[in-house]
Each structure stands twice: as structure tokens, then as C-alpha cells.
Amino acid sequence: MILPFEYYFLNDADNSSKSNYNNIQFINENQNNNLRQKPKFYPNNQFLIEQEQDKYENKKIKNYISDQIQLQPKNTPINKMNHFANINNYQDNKFSLESLNQAQQDNLQKEEDLSILSFDSQEELNYLQEGEENNQFLNEGDIFGYQTRYTFFENRNNLLVEDATNKNNNNYNYNYNNNNSSTQRNYDFNYQNTNEMLQKKKKSNFQNKSQSQLNNHKNEEKKPSQQRKEQLMKRFESLSRIYNKELSQTVTNGWLKPSQAKTISQDNNLGSSAAKSSKVFYQQQKPFSAQITNSSLKYAAASNGFQNLDFSYKQKQQLIQQETKNKIKEQQNVESNNRISMKPPKSANLNSYKNISNLKNFKEIILTRPNSKQVKFQQQNSVNSQPSSLVSQPLKIQSIEKNNLNSNLNDQNFYDDFAELGSTETTGFSFQNVFQLAGVPKDFIASPRSPVQELNQKQENRENELDQMLNDHHIYVASSVTNQNQIKNEQTERKPNMFGKTLTTLARPFSKEYSNRKDILKSAQQNVRFNKNLDYLDSQNKVVAKNKKRTIFKINQNNLQGNQKDLQSNQTSSVISQQNSIQQYGDDNYQQNQVLNDDQSPLIKQNSIDLNAAEIIQNDENENTQKENVLQQKKNQSNQIVTSQQQSNNYFKQETTTNTSNFSTTSNRIISLQALRQKNNSTVKNSDNNNQNQTNPQNQNTNLKENNDKQNLKKTKIQSASANQAGQSNNQLQKTFFINSQDEYVRRTLLRMGWKENKLLLNNNFDLKWIYIDSNDDYKFLNDNQFYNHFKNNTELTQKGRLLYNLKNNTQFGVNQELFFPRCYDLGNDQERGEFSNEFNRMNVMNLLKKHIQYIKLRRSQTYQEIKQAYQQKQANKLNAQVKDGIFFAKVTKQKFFSPLMYEDTKRDNRFIFNITVIAEAVEILKKLKRQQEEYIDETRQSRDCQLYIYQTNFKLESMISQYVKINVPFDEEKFVFEKIVGMSKEHWSSPSMKLMKKLYSLYKYFKDADPQFKVSGTKNIWIIKPSANSRGSGIYLVDKLDEAIDSGLKMQARIVQKYIERPLIFQGAKYKKLNNKKFDIRQWVLVTSFKPLKIYFFTSSYLRVCSQSFDLDNIKILSKHLTNFSLNKNSLAKENWDETVVELKDFISYLKEFKNIDYQEDVKPKIKDLVIETIKCAADKIVNRKKSFELYGFDILLDEYAHPWLLEVNLSPACSERSSFLTEMLDAMAYKMFQIVFKQNNLQEDLEINKETAISTAPASCQNPDYDWEEIYNEEQKEYFCEEDNNMQLAFNNDIQLMVIGQKADLKKEKNLDKKYFQYWGAIKIQSKIRSFLAKKKLQRLKNQKFTFAAIKIQQKMRQFLAKKQLNILKKQQQTNINIPIEDFNQVSVIEV
């Protein structure tokens, strides 16, 4: 049972140009369950297959294949499925399903064409199927499609072929994968059974044939002869050697005309079968072959068989060798005197020889190659001479293995191989010779679509491209003598040139113009290299030139102040030194301009900036000295110096003009050798003239004395005035800044203020540095006069974990962070993780209380009013507290034990039902929390650290409360839902009493007043988890379960959890446009210019960030409903609607006044200012102050439904994308006025702005808006106290201490009274404690002494009773015996005894 096509099929061949391997698709096993369904008569415990099973399976396979073929379009190219269909339907082909066995996977290459061929007779087919001796031929024949079975796999869309023919085994193993189970059923059977099955299936495949035809067919089944075997082997070797990828280029879109197929078949002795088969395909509009691959062309696949192929491989090989030998002899006869070695030139591309497989697989091809020695010999004789006729020697190339058929026409190395093979001068190089040697027919080579024509055309295009490159890039030509030496010394080296490639290979070194082009390229490389070296040396020369100039100017000043004799003697040296300095300055400027025009390295630009700055400072220092020297010296001396400078300047101008003119002319064209020589001669003459002028200073002196004194004085005044103007302009342009962030508004503002940007990253030449995030290394390399937009240790405010730590520590200074910062915990700390779990459970109890009170308030308003009035009256009549002498004495009540019956009374409201068990437990927990909170000194502080020990003893009630709170159904239906979840019986549900409801209201009222976050915390118990250091909303998510929050803290330590404000301010109504039913927060800019003393500025305007989706607490997984970060919300909006995520402050103020009747300027803004001040003060001591540093912070503030501000986080370098027009205006105004404040405090305002008019002209138009301004909200001025007398003995440790007086002056009388009262109360407490202990001990001693007396009294009482009874019994006996005793005597005796 064989199922080769049941699991896989091919897609419709839409892309016919692609390979067949890309059209493979895996079939889902569930799509063909009917094919894999096991028949009913399958045996369970047997491994033999009966005839009925084979027929059943084969019918299914044939029907499935035919259905797949019908689904394909008619004009699609022949793919694998078409071949498989032809196997079953084509009568001449004797394949059967059983013959499609697996072929070896190791012998298959990915890019080989797997085509199916027909055979001459059935005997050839049987010859391939039978016997062990033919297995080798089968393995070798896999390249041409002698595979016996195909299976398709999805691994990289490649088709793998496995060999099913085992060399020493005749057994066959088959695997059948059942769809319903993963077990594999292996069916093994003998070879005899397979022969019987083959015969049965052959009958089914040829049902249309008569019985006579089948008998004739069986008689024809004979093994082929030995001669036929040899022909098949030779056919395989010849086709694998000759027909390759180049031949496949002739086929246009897979088509081949019959005439071309006929000529090809005749030239190669392949018979007429190729022409016949191609004619049939061409008429039926079918492709020439299944697919022409990149590795080789399968001509046998195109011709659909090896029919009538009669030729001898040895004869063909001999003909090829004779042709090559004849060509070699002809070349040797013509040029026998010029034999050279086989060694290729060094300039050739040697890497291409490694890939010699590009020359294809022919066994021995004799090629020619020029020798590098003769090239050297000709270059030594004359550079302009071309290489003469070169004699080539044969070069034998070993045959390559058959499997190495991977070659690409698009590969550049392929063309380099042919270009480097070379040729003689007479014949020239051509690809025709190579293809002829390979055995390609001449008619095919001459055709216009042959690869030979394409290769020749590409070679010509490469030559044209080289000529164009030489003309476009302006390569200079050096002298012939230097070129000869360079070629001699550097011929063996391969160096990259200015084009990024090796132009020696592009120049085709064995062409006619090889020598000239090689000289041009070598000279171009050296000229470019020489120019680069000069440019890189400029930076070092400029530093040396600075020092020379300073020394020269000092020498000139000393000479001018000296005597006349000294001036006359040193006149010549001073003039020469000045001329040299001016020449040097001119050369530096000329080189600098050349560097800037060519866009050289940034290092040279940096040095030029430093040079200009040094020159400006030097001119400013020497202005006054030059004026004084000119007035003091004599007229002749001043005339001489001025005229010498003028002459040197004129000379410098002439020299620079000649240099620039030569440079401009040479940049437009390639100058010749004569032009270079003329230029060199002209420069030599100019240098000679220059030396003559320098060596004859007397002639200059005579000309200098002839000038007038007045004209010289006017010229000096004009020069000094122009220098002053240039100095002022240079001073304004000296201010530079460096920016490395996305804040474009900062760049615009500084450029508007006259600053220049320094774009060099590794450069410290700037006056202001603006970056996104700072590092500790930045502060090490900063100078004292450089501005920086950060303070060291600013993470104390901007990191969420550090901000939490600083705010908690700030409570000891009287700041209650619970009023403006939601509860927050660090999940990386074990202690705070435990506090968070307690807080989470506490919030569940609080939410339970809120839920019941809210239900009573909404559904039973009358009952709620009664409870409220009773609570107010109870608080008014409370007389258990008294105040004496300012001391509060409270009545202490005993703790009552928990009992649900204590809240039962006769008054009940039967209209609603509560879970009395859960409510009573919650009330007891709230009472304990209340007592623990009242024990704190600060009553307003929230009791967060209290341990809820009741949860540890009764964990079941804890889970019940948490589950009861999370029920999100109407209150009347909670009973039924809660019973299903918890499983509590109906006995726990009953209507609440008035006493219970009053107790709930009193607890609700207490926690509402004591807890500032009680109103905004909501009833869902949602918490938000944030990474400590991330920004822009990354890594943030919301949770409502304790386990999720704690697990996130254990996995990632740098995380905090913060209480989510469930009741924010939400506007409802279409008139509010962007804010309708959406959450928002406020981004407030704050500027800090100093931390010691602390100076805080508050920007008067701000903007609102709005969520892109409506607010919904039931869906906490969609972050765009809860977070306002633009980086998260922009993905859910189109780019045109990005402005919906931002709202201007003035619109919000009007909405707030209309919706809540709240004034933002009076009610909200002052609270935000206090929030900012307290937040910055908590970390001010830990941030390092710097004089010229400043910091811009972004405070994110959220308003609850009562318009109370809450701090969410503080952002470092707040990012603001300019997605609205008002944002750009506000940013420009904010940045401009921010820099005005920063520069004004550091006395830089005068340098930046000369007058008010220029300041107004440079300011943006938005600065005129009064709403856009900075307001100083906190200024902690530093107060310094000094002694009236000089104190020279100042201590060292007092230098850095900053003391400040806080509070009022001390009153001594009040202090004394307070001390007396304190000692009195303290003494009374001590005395009382001693007396109480004394009295207690005395009482115990008294009890110990009295216990003996009590015991004696008890014993006496018992004894008396016993004696009295005994005496009465005696008297009774005497009366019975008639003994008369007087009563008086009896009484006396009894009394005495007693």
C-alpha cells in the first residue's frame, strides 16, 4: 500500500517564473479524513494486505490526483502534479504507483530540476527497477529524474527525494499514518507478493487496452542489452558536461521553437526525438521544460526522452581534443618567439580562480593566458605603448566533479574569470571560443538570444562605464616618469582606490588600452592619497601656526618700543617674519577652504573653529597696542611697517587667486601632463620671485619712505574700526550649543537667539549642552562656564522608586504625602511587599463597607437619613471627654468580644437582605483598625502598618470577603450569586437591624474623614504596576488580584505598585468634544535653576493629555482606556486625529467652570503649586547643585471627581510631540523665556542681547501671549551673617555649613512655666507609680497573714457544731432513762464549754 500523494499537493502555479519548490504547500490532515479513513475489513492483528485492500486504496489515490489536476488552470506550466498525472494516464510510460519509491536524500541538490522522462520501452524501465547491479546507475541518474518515488516536505519549501531501493534487500517497508491515532502501522511483505500486486495494478492502469495488447506488452518486457546500457551512461555524462546554465538563457519564458530543438539535437547526435517532442509541446502551448533551474539545463527533460540517441562519447571527446590542439599549434606557429609563463598577473582578480567551477564541467579545456613578465617588459620600454601580440601557452584545467554545477550568471566573479583568461592581440578575447571549446553548437552561439551575445555586450558596457567613471571623477594624471616607477614598485599590490573597487580588473588588463588606463588609475590613487595626507596634516600645522603668530606679534611689539637704531637693524628681520606669518596664515586659510569644499573629516572643522576663536581673542588684545605704537613711533618707521604689510597682503592675494584659478580649472576636466608641468614651472618661478623680494629688503625700504604720513594714519584708523566691528560680530557668533534629543523647539529657540549648533558628537567645544539623559561622565568633562540642562542625582525625583522613598521619609518633617500622592509600595522590598498585601486586604473590607452604605443611600434614602441624624445627635451629646489645663482625658472602655447576636434587635427592615456573617466579621475588623489608628500621635495619619491578625486566625472569612466584594451584579441578586461561589447556606442571610446599620454608618463616617484617599479609591480594588525607570508608558499594566501583583514584583525587582484612582474627573456630554467620557491628566512644566538655594519656576500654562478610548473600569487590559501616554494612544488613532489626544488649558478651564462650577485659578492651581514645592523639597538635599545647570521637569497630575490634584510621576526631559498648532506656539514661548531666565541669572543677558529691539525681533510671536510665562513660586534665598570685627581665625568646618533660623524668638517666662508644669506632672506620675506598687505589696502581705486566722475560724465552727450535736444526743438518752436534770444546770454547762 503506497500513498505518495495523499499528504501533500502543489498550489496553483500562479507564479510561473518561480521555481517549483516555492509552490509546495502542506495539506492539513483534517481536510482529507475520508482518504485516510480505515476500511472496515482491515485486520487488527495481521500484517498481510489482501487484494481488495490494494484496490480500495489505489482507487482513492487516483481519484484524488485527478481532482487536483482539474483544479489547476489550463495554461499553467507543467509542474510536478502534471507529471504525476501523466504517469497514470500516459500509455507509453509504464510507470505504476508501486514504482514511485523513495530515492536517497543525500544525493539530491536543492536547485536541481526533477523532471520525469519517458523511456524507449518497458525493458528499460524493468532494467532500472530490478537487480542490485544497477543501483549505482540509479543514484547517478537522480540528477535527470530517474527517481522512483517522490515525497514532498515543507522544510524550506524544498522537494526532498528519498531512495526506496535497498542495495542488499528486496523487502519493502511502508508507513501509514492514521488520522485518528498517532500510531504507525508497518506492513511488511515479500517480494513475491509485490510482483503479484504489480501485475494487478498494471491491469487496472491499462483497462482500456484489450487483452491482446497486454499480452504483447508482457512479451516485450526484456532486459536491455549491454550496448544500450553504455549508451545511457555516455548520454548522462555528455549532457551533464555540455548543457549548463548558459544554454538555459536561450529559452525565453520556458519556450523553445521546434526549429531550434531540431538543430540542437542534430548537432549533438541526439536524434529527432527532441525536435518531435518540442514540436508537440510548442503546438500545445506548453513550456519547453518543467522548470529551467539555476544549476543546469536538462536537455533530456526538454526533449522528453533519450530516443534514437546514437553517438560515441569517446569520439566526441577526441574531436574536442583535436580542435584544441590545432588551435594551439596555430598560435604557437604565429608567435613562437614570445612564449611566456602560465603565471597570471598580480593585478588580476585571483579570487575568481577559486570559483573555477563557473567555467562548467568539461574535462580538459585548453585555455590561454598572458604573462605578467611581458607586460612588465613593455611598461619599462614605454608607458604609452600598448601590449603587443602576446603568445599564450596552454593551461590545463582539471575536470570538476559532476555535482559542482552551482553557477550563477549574475555572479560578478563569472565575468571576471572570462576576462582574466586573456587572449592574443590578433584574435582578441571572445566568449565564443570558450563555448566552442565546451562543445556548444555554432548555430546556437550565433543566435541573437544566446548567452555569448549577452556576455560580449556586458563586457562592452563595463568598458564604457570605466571611461565614464574616469571622466566623471576628475582623475589627475601624473608625469610619465613617476608612473613608470610606481608601476614597477607597486604592480604586485592590490589596493582599493577612490571608487571603492579594484579598477585594474575593471579596466580589462589584457585589452588594447590596458597600459594607459592602468597608468591613469595608479596616478589617480596616488594623487588622492597625497591630497588626503595634506588635509589631515592641516590640523597639526594650525596649532603650530598659532604659537608662531603669538611669538611674532610679541617680537614686533618689542621692536616698536625699542630705539631707532634697534629698529633699523632689525627692520629686515621683522618684515621677513611678518611676511612669513602672513603667508603661513594665507596657506592655512587656503587649505581650510579646500577642506571645507571637499567635506573632509570633522576634526579639521573643529580645529578651524578653535583657530578662529584664538584669532579673535588675539585681535582684541592687540588693537590698543597697535594704535599706541603707531602714534608714538616716527613717521618713517610707521610708513615702513604699514607698507610692508600691504605689499605682503597684495602678494598673498595674487598667490591665492592663481591657486584658486588652477584648482577650478583642474576640477572641471582631467589635465594633461603638459599642463601639470607648466603649473609646476609657474609655481617654481613664483617662489623664486618671492625669495628675491625677501632677500632685498633695501628696495622695499626706499619705496616705503615715499608714502605720506596722513594717508597711513587714516588707513590705520579704518583698519582698527573694521577690526572692532568684526570682533563684535565674532563674539556674537562664538556662542555654540550641542543638542542630542528630539526636542526641536530647543534647537529653534537657540538658533533664533543667535547661537550656532555644534553637530560633532565627540567635541567639548560648546557653551550649552542639551541632552535627553545624563550620565556621571558628563559632569567630569564640563567646564565652569558651560551650561547643562541636568543636575547630578536628578533620579531622586524622576525615578519612581526613589521618589517613593523620598516622599515617605519626608513625613518626619510634617509633610503628609497621603494628601497628594496615591499609596505606593516597592515590590522589590520584602517589608513593603508584606505591607502591600495587608493594604490590599484592608481595601477589600473598606470596599465592602462602601458597597452596603451606597446601597442603603440609593435604595433606602429615608432609612439613611434616620441613621445619619442619629449619628449626628450622638456626636453632639457625647460627654465622655473632658479637657483640663490643656490635657485631654478620654474615657477608656473595655473591649467586647465578637458575637453576631450583638447587632440583633426587634427593629428590622425586611425590604432588603444582608449577609450577616460577612458583615459582622468586617465590622469587627474595622473596629480594630479604628482603635489602632487612634493610638498614633498624629490622628490624620493613615494606619497602613497595622497587622490584620484576624486574617491569620480566620483565613476562610478573608477569602469570603474578597469574593463577596468582587461580585459585579445588582445588590438584590448578590445572594444567589454568592451562594454559588462560596456555598453558604441561607441561614447566613437575613435583613439587617437598625443597630447594625448605625454601626456601619459610624465606621463609614470615621474612615471617610480620617483617610484622605477613601473617596477616590473606589470599590474595584484596582492597582497599577509601573517599572521604576521606564517612561512613555512602557511596561505598565493594571491588576485587581493580589497574586498577580506579587508575582510581578518577584520576577522583576525594579517595580512599584500604586493605587489606581478609580474615580477620576470625567466629563460627560457631547459639548465637551474631546473630553467626552475619556480620562485625562495635566502635564505641567516646572523649571529649577538652583537647589542651593532652591529656586522653582512654574509655567503659567499647561495642556491636557487625553486617552483615545472611553473610560471603563470593567476592562483594565486595554491600556488606551486608562493611560494618556501619546506613544500608546497614537496606535489606535489615524495620524489625522492625533490632535484629539491633547486639549488646551483655556478650554479645560471653561469646561470645569460649567460642569463642576469650580474655578481653576483659585481652587486647583494653588494646590498644584503646593504639590510641586513639597515634591521637589523632599529630594533637594540629595541632588548636587551646580552653578550653570538647570533642569526642566514634567509633572503628570490627575484630578479626581472633586477636582483635587494627585501626583502620578515626575518626568526627566519631558517629551512633547508637536501634534497641534497651539503646542508649537506654547513650546517656543516656553523655551525662549526659559533661556532668558537661565542666562539672566548667570549675567549672560548682555552678551546675548545688545538691546531690547533685537530681543523683541528674535522672540517668537507667541511670547506676546500673557498666558505663556514663567512664575517664580519658591525662592529660598541664602542668608549670610558676618561679624562686625574681622575674624581671621575662621574655622574650616564652617565654610560649607548653611544655617537658617526658623520660627519665632523664645519667651523665657513661658519656657519656665512649661518646665514647672512638666516637672510637676512628671513627679506626680512617678510618685503614683511608686505608691501603687507599695500598696499592692502591702495588701498582698496582709492577705498572706490573714489566711491562717480564716482557716482556724472555719475549723472551730465545724468542731462546735459537732460537739453540740453530740451533747444533744446524750440528753435525749437521759430523758429516756428518767434521769431528771435541772434545766438551769444544763444551760450553765453548755455555756461554759462554749
From Swiss-Prot:
GO molecular function, one term: protein-glycine ligase activity, initiating
Region named Disordered: 201-230, 563-582, 620-663, 682-706
Free-text function comment from the UniProt entry: Probable glycylase which modifies tubulin, generating side chains of glycine on the gamma-carboxyl groups of specific glutamate residues within the C-terminal tail of tubulin.
Name of this chain's protein: Tubulin glycylase 3E
Gene deletion effect: Cells lacking TTLL3A, TTLL3B, TTLL3C, TTLL3D, TTLL3E and TTLL3F display shortened axonemes that are resistant to paclitaxel, indicating that tubulin glycylation changes the lattice properties of axonemal microtubules. Axonemes are however normal at the ultrastructural level.
GO biological process: protein polyglycylation
Enzyme Commission number(s) from the entry: 6.3.2.-
